[in-house]
Amino acid sequence: LNESTIAKAPFALGYRATIYLGHWALHYESAETAPNWEYQKINTNFHDNRGSNTPYRMHYVQEMQKVVQGGLTAKVPAAKDVQKMMLLKAAEKTKLPLSFETIVGAGTKNERVYDLPPARIGYLYAYASAVNEKGKVTYGEVYLVLKGNKKSLVIKNVTSQGIGAWIPIQ
């Protein structure tokens, strides 16, 4: 759909064109990647064992579906492109399955057992984990320059900006 071709002209004397393609996010350089194992609380299981004389075996069960959102910590141009670059770099560094949106479904269970002693109240908290990614994104204005039979990309007005993101672990 958006494909363009430029054919060579045999006599392209005096032929010159500069086409502005846009202001793009060109590069992302990671400075720090750190996991946060308690990024967002997603569930609480509760049991009151005060009236019992026997221990209660407590399991984790997700009570409601929970959507965990990540995102950039600042507004930047071309945010979707920056998110993709940061996601790729963070996944490469951590070797974890990352996504800017993670869903924990209702009824999700874990087989691990927690014994609740008699005459006690028990709370079991569940948290979604996330990775905090910080770095620097580079922007530039991209031009297609045609001069005679020569074609080239030229990048002008290059700027850098610090950026951070929270990326939930799936």
Give a label for each model feature:
Residues G105-S129, G135-V137:
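Tight coil/turn sites that cap or link beta-strands
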Residues T54-N110, K136, G140, N149-K150, ...:
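Membrane-insertion modules used to breach or fuse lipid bilayers
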Residues I6, I19, I42, I103, ...:
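Weak global preference for isoleucine
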Residues P10, P35, P77, P97, ...:
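Proline-rich intrinsically disordered, low-complexity coils
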Residues S129-A130, Y143:
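Short, surface-exposed interaction patches in beta-rich subdomains
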Residues L1-G71, S99-I103, G107-V113, L146:
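Deployable pore-forming modules of oligomeric membrane-permeabilizing proteins
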